[in-house]
A protein has these predicted regions:
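Short amphipathic beta-strand/extended segments in non-transmembrane regions
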Residues: 1-49, 162-169
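Aromatic/His-enriched, Gly/Pro-containing loop or helix-boundary segments
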Residues: 59
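Hydrophobic alpha-helical transmembrane segments of multi-pass inner-membrane transport and secretion
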Residues: 205-224
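Mid-to-C-terminal secondary-structure elements
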Residues: 34-49, 62-205
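Short hydrophobic/aromatic segments of transmembrane alpha-helices and their interfaces
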Residues: 24-25, 53, 130-132, 215
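Short, solvent-exposed loop/turn elements at beta->coil junctions and helix N-caps
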Residues: 17-23, 53-55, 84-86
Length: 224
């Protein structure tokens, strides 16, 4: 059995934002949706207007929406318990509104109008066992005392197991291992660095130079 270094909470999966058609009565809106695990809100804090702030989306048949969306759909900010219809791929499915979130500020790193259970995404069944799938970020909260390097080291065997074919192809094509002898490695990126990260030849790099350069030029212009 291969196991990771213990984490404070299990990994939280989150797709890139999708537009989802949400209907109630005669009202239809294309909303900015985020497909997340039901315990997503145990790591990220989104103030709740109505409902359980720790678990505003308690099961796979529930969704959480913002005050603004509730007002648009139902004519009131208290839409708790109402049934909405969501276009999930080619199917229309009913969901219960179990949480009303306060409107998310525009400058938030994570911004959406409706949160939907991750397992209901139209591609979930196709890719649930595809370990090389990279279409969504995965967030991990480490247990207190566990360092990033310790966690990454604990994932080496897991990476080898689930990426064997890819690694063999890399070796065949002449790829060189990193300083630790790894051809593929799971790496963690601190959330504070997410806006400074980019991939160069499939290697994650964090560069803060450009934003600070722009900021410096702005200050120079102001003082001139």
């Amino acid at each position: 059995m291969i196991s990771f270094m213990r984490t404070k909470s299990r990994s939280i999966k989150c797709t890139l934002s999708e537009n989802v058609l949400v209907s109630f009565g005669e009202n239809d809106y294309n909303l900015d949706a985020e497909f997340v695990d039901t315990d997503y809100f145990s790591i990220f804090s989104f103030p709740t207007f109505i409902g359980d702030s720790a678990k505003p989306m308690p099961d796979q048949n529930s969704v959480a929406i913002t005050e603004e969306v509730s007002k648009k759909l139902f004519g009131t900010t208290n839409g708790l318990g109402k049934i909405v219809r969501l276009q999930i791929g080619k199917e229309e499915k009913p969901f219960t509104v179990s949480g009303i979130l306060k409107n998310i500020p525009n400058n938030s790193s994570i911004n959406f109008e409706i949160a939907i259970p991750f397992t209901t995404h139209w591609d979930y069944k196709e890719y649930v066992d595809a370990w090389d799938s990279r279409n969504h970020p995965v967030y991990v909260q480490l247990e207190e005392g566990v360092t990033t390097s310790q966690f990454e080291k604990s994932t080496v065997d897991f990476t080898l197991l689930h990426n064997e074919e890819q690694i063999n192809n890399m070796k065949r094509d002449g790829a060189q291992p990193d300083v630790n002898g790894n051809y593929a490695q799971l790496k963690l990126l601190p959330s504070t660095d997410m806006h400074f990260a980019n991939f160069n030849a499939e290697t994650l790099q964090v560069k803060r130079t450009f934003p600070y350069l722009v900021l410096g030029i702005a200050f120079l212009i102001v003082f001139i």
